[in-house]
Regions:
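Short beta-strand/loop segment at the start of cytosolic alpha/beta domains
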Residues: 1-20
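Amphipathic alpha-helical interaction surfaces in cytosolic regulatory modules
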Residues: 24-103
Length: 104
């Protein structure tokens, strides 16, 4: 299935975990994204989680909810989440949700 490839290229660099998210994220596959990210965070407690969204042309509010939950989980462990390479539509959605400033 498509969902297996949602999160790729996961690697750890010092105390940072880097991962790339791929594809449009919406109600159908945001639960898969959530599962992937929470599993990653169960295995590791990174000081920084850096998510490359270059290959995410679109996400809906369910995907944003997953990102916020991920952020809260990482912050609880004293870490930070960074979203990089945002495409315009995704950036616009985060701005509308007034979230563009919390993922920095």
């Amino acid at each position: 299935t498509m969902s297996i490839d949602l999160v790729r290229d996961v690697r750890t660099q010092g105390n940072a975990m880097l991962a790339s998210v791929h594809g449009e994220i919406d109600l159908h596959n945001s639960p898969d994204l959530r599962g992937h990210l929470l599993r990653l965070l169960d295995d590791a407690k990174p000081a920084k989680l850096i998510l490359n969204l270059a290959d995410v042309p679109y996400m809906d509010s369910s995907a944003i909810a997953v990102l916020v939950e991920t952020l809260q989980k990482v912050r609880k462990g004293g870490g930070k989440v960074y979203l990089t390479h945002l495409q315009p539509r995704v950036k616009g959605l985060l701005e509308i949700a007034r979230l563009e400033t919390i993922f920095v």
